[in-house]
Amino acid sequence: MTAGRARFMMGSSRQESTPVNRIEHIALMANYNQWMNRKLYDAASTLTETQLAADRNAFFGSILGTLNHLTLGDTVWLKRFAQHPAGFAALVPLSSLAMPVDLKQVAFGTLRELSDRRAWLYQLIIDWAHSLREPDLDHRLHYHTMRGMAADKPFFSLLVHFFNHQTHHRGQATTLLTQAGVDVGDTDLLAIID
């Protein structure tokens, strides 16, 4: 795998393509997550802290608010995933973090603080994604929602939601950056697939 690019074989030119298995899909999404977050933070770093914190009438207010939401949301889900019966060693460092209680809070007041946490998180996500095994995906995960309601969902479906949530809010952040005059560049998943 080249830096920032993932290699996923989809079959040869002589045979019908074969589907990517679930573990490969998760690894691809973890790599895409890291690549896109780096692009977003590089783009955001061209703005001042005042521009980043400016209310843009977005769901999370500002660019900084949207990026904070992504980081807090990832933290919530990863802490839930740490309760999986497999006891993922890559997620143990999360035990020192408090569970976020408000996904709209600006927990990190500067891009530098947020960027440091984000870099730590996306490396943790990659390490964890590469530690997953196929049988891990077939469990149901018991957790509590942000409102305290008990929930029980298929683990693989929760992973799909986790990465989809990131993509959704990165799209919002990309729009806010574009409106602020910053070009994030190519954001397509295809850009990292060989």
Residue ranges of model-derived segments:
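Short, charged, low-complexity loops and linkers
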Residues: 19-29, 104
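Helix-adjacent hinge/juxtasegments
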Residues: 86-132
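Residue-level recognition of alpha-helical structural elements
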Residues: 22, 52, 59, 107-110, ...
